[in-house]
């Protein structure tokens, strides 16, 4: 992908950013109706940094996360992932970059029900072109690190809610991405299990230097991240610790 990388000189902050958004805008259109979500939004996430995005329901938090992950296309502006300008990539190239550079964890685990925990976690490695033995080795290592080494042959229906979400975290991290994007990753769990999964994500962040960008309604969890950004009326602003 080097041939499509920007030729422009980057600032030190830009060069070390795992994800960067510049003048990002998104407007949904239906017939003659236009619904702007945000306009002129800037964001930079450094290697190993943890960022929480908070805001009211309907503020556009999930939309922003989808744009950062290349799952949606901005109306204008640019998103850079691992130094690559997403708008310059084909659909196939974007998919490959997502698989290699990003991990995704959602409120609902989205594990494939017909496959075991091991097979679910192996999937991103296989999609990156590595052979089965390598994929199995990486998946087993991650499942062990999230406390599921004894559950690798169980299907999602045989796992508890917390175990399914831990499996989803392992799947997100198995390719050692630069950044994990989480959309309410603990929102469907009870408080105790949510705390366990959140601690796990922070431990893996420290161990692998993987950046985290988490959309959450839980201000208590948000306060434990490096930065808290509030999306309100299309604007993104950093909150002081006392305001979170």
Swiss-Prot record:
Keywords from the UniProt entry: ATP-binding, Cell inner membrane, Cell membrane, Membrane, Nucleotide-binding, Translocase, Transport
Principal subcellular localisation of the protein: membrane
Gene Ontology annotations for the cellular component aspect, listed alphabetically: plasma membrane
Binding residues for ATP: 55-62
EC class name: translocase
Pfam family, one: ABC_tran
TM annotation in the entry: none
Stored SUPFAM superfamilies: P-loop containing nucleoside triphosphate hydrolases
Membrane topology designation: Peripheral membrane protein
GO MF, any single term: ATP hydrolysis activity
Domain of life of the organism encoding this protein: Bacteria
Gene3D superfamilies: P-loop containing nucleotide triphosphate hydrolases
Gene Ontology process terms (BP): lipoprotein localization to outer membrane; protein localization to outer membrane
Residue span(s) of domain ABC transporter: 19-244
PANTHER family per the UniProt record, alphabetical: IMPORT ATP-BINDING PROTEIN, LIPOPROTEIN-RELEASING SYSTEM ATP-BINDING PROTEIN LOLD
Subunit field text: The complex is composed of two ATP-binding proteins (LolD) and two transmembrane proteins (LolC and LolE).
Stated role: Part of the ABC transporter complex LolCDE involved in the translocation of mature outer membrane-directed lipoproteins, from the inner membrane to the periplasmic chaperone, LolA. Responsible for the formation of the LolA-lipoprotein complex in an ATP-dependent manner.
Family statement drawn from the similarity comment of this UniProt entry: Belongs to the ABC transporter superfamily. Lipoprotein translocase (TC 3.A.1.125) family.
Protein name, per record: Lipoprotein-releasing system ATP-binding protein LolD
Originating species: Xanthomonas euvesicatoria pv. vesicatoria (strain 85-10)
